[in-house]
Amino acid sequence: MSTFGGPGTAARDDLAQDFVAFAVEAGVLRFGEFKTKAGRLSPYFFNAGLFDDGAKLGRLAEFYARRMQASGLAFDMIFGPAYKGITLAAAVAIELARLGRNLPYAYNRKETKDHGEGGSLVGAKLHGRVVIIDDVISAGTSVRESVAMIRAAGAEPCGVAIALDRQERATETTQDGVRDADHSAVQFVQRELGLAVCAIATLSDLLQYLARQADPALAQHLPRVQAYRDRYGV
């Protein structure tokens, strides 16, 4: 189960299972050997940039909206950090409006504009309780920057909605070099920034999906994904 406040339990989460199946079918979630930003060799890779047509993006927005509505989190508007978060925020705002909840949204530019309306923020004025929407939380940098912008505008960041929680230990730099932390990037955001984190699905959900597969082409990946979780998971 993938809800606000934690990575979930072993109970089956139908929304998460449907999302994992969708991501696999869309080619967004792939299996093989992939090098992560932390330098680890991961047996799977999630690339939200491959939700690259109207149908895929619309369905992705449905998953976000359903998870957010079920979360119980109260929020007044949506914020999408540049760059991937911009499209996600717009798509989710459209889907929520379709479901009867019309909320404002905003996003930031990475380059401050010095003409026209100027500034780095675009869209509705930030106000009230703001939920941040992104694809994943890798190091928490984007979330920290978003929190600073939202607070500087006088609004309150209240949570982060993401597509996938990898549930793996973050890395941290010490005087002896880079080492694995005892927490994930999502846990850092929860503990240090005080924000609820909502994931449509988690690594636990992916493992459940693989364990249920009758297709050997998919089931064969379960041992490697489980071994990765055993080594780097939280």
UniProtKB/Swiss-Prot annotation:
GO terms for MF: magnesium ion binding; orotate phosphoribosyltransferase activity
Positions bound to orotate: 45-46, 138, 166
Keyword Iron-sulfur: no
Keywords: Glycosyltransferase, Magnesium, Pyrimidine biosynthesis, Transferase
EC number: 2.4.2.10
Catalysed reaction, written as an equation: orotidine 5'-phosphate + diphosphate = orotate + 5-phospho-alpha-D-ribose 1-diphosphate
InterPro entries, A to Z: OPRT, Or_phspho_trans_dom, PRibTrfase_dom, PRTase-like
This protein's pathway: Pyrimidine metabolism; UMP biosynthesis via de novo pathway; UMP from orotate: step 1/2
Known role: Catalyzes the transfer of a ribosyl phosphate group from 5-phosphoribose 1-diphosphate to orotate, leading to the formation of orotidine monophosphate (OMP).
Similarity annotation: Belongs to the purine/pyrimidine phosphoribosyltransferase family. PyrE subfamily.
Subunit organization: Homodimer.
UniProt protein name: Orotate phosphoribosyltransferase
Gene source species: Methylibium petroleiphilum (strain ATCC BAA-1232 / LMG 22953 / PM1)
Lineage start: Bacteria, Pseudomonadati, Pseudomonadota, Betaproteobacteria, Burkholderiales
